[in-house]
């Protein structure tokens, strides 16, 4: 028997997570993301988010 109402709700999946992972696997994109943010770094390397 599970006490589902006691746990935190499941977080909604992040639609940008697959793109974030692509950027993290590219050392240059990952480094740039640390400075200017993931979305801008991804845009510079791969185009529109």
UniProtKB/Swiss-Prot annotation:
Processing and modification events after translation: Gamma-carboxyglutamate residues are formed by vitamin K dependent carboxylation by GGCX. These residues are essential for the binding of calcium. Decarboxylation promotes the hormone activity.
Predominant location category: secreted
Stretches assigned to coiled coil: none
Residues annotated to bind Ca(2+) 3: 24, 30
Modification 4-carboxyglutamate occurs at: 17, 21, 24
Residues reported to bind Ca(2+) 2: 21, 24
Record keywords, A-Z: Biomineralization, Calcium, Disulfide bond, Gamma-carboxyglutamic acid, Hormone, Hydroxylation, Metal-binding, Secreted
Matches recorded under SUPFAM superfamilies: GLA-domain (SSF57630)
Residues reported to bind Ca(2+) 1: 17
Disulfide bond residue pairs: 23-29
Domain (Gla): residue spans on this chain: 1-47
Localization (cell): Secreted
Residue list for modification 4-hydroxyproline: 9
GO molecular function per UniProt: calcium ion binding; hormone activity; hydroxyapatite binding; structural constituent of bone
One cellular component term from this protein's GO annotations in UniProt: cytoplasm
One of the GO biological process terms: type B pancreatic cell proliferation
Protein role: The carboxylated form is one of the main organic components of the bone matrix, which constitutes 1-2% of the total bone protein: it acts as a negative regulator of bone formation and is required to limit bone formation without impairing bone resorption or mineralization. The carboxylated form binds strongly to apatite and calcium.
Similarity section: Belongs to the osteocalcin/matrix Gla protein family.
Official protein name in the record: Osteocalcin
């Amino acid at each position: 028997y599970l006490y589902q109402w006691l746990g935190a709700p499941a977080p909604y999946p992040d639609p940008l997570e697959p793109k974030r992972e692509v950027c993290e696997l590219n050392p240059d994109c990952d480094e740039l993301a640390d400075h200017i943010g993931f979305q801008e770094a991804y845009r510079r390397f791969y185009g529109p988010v």
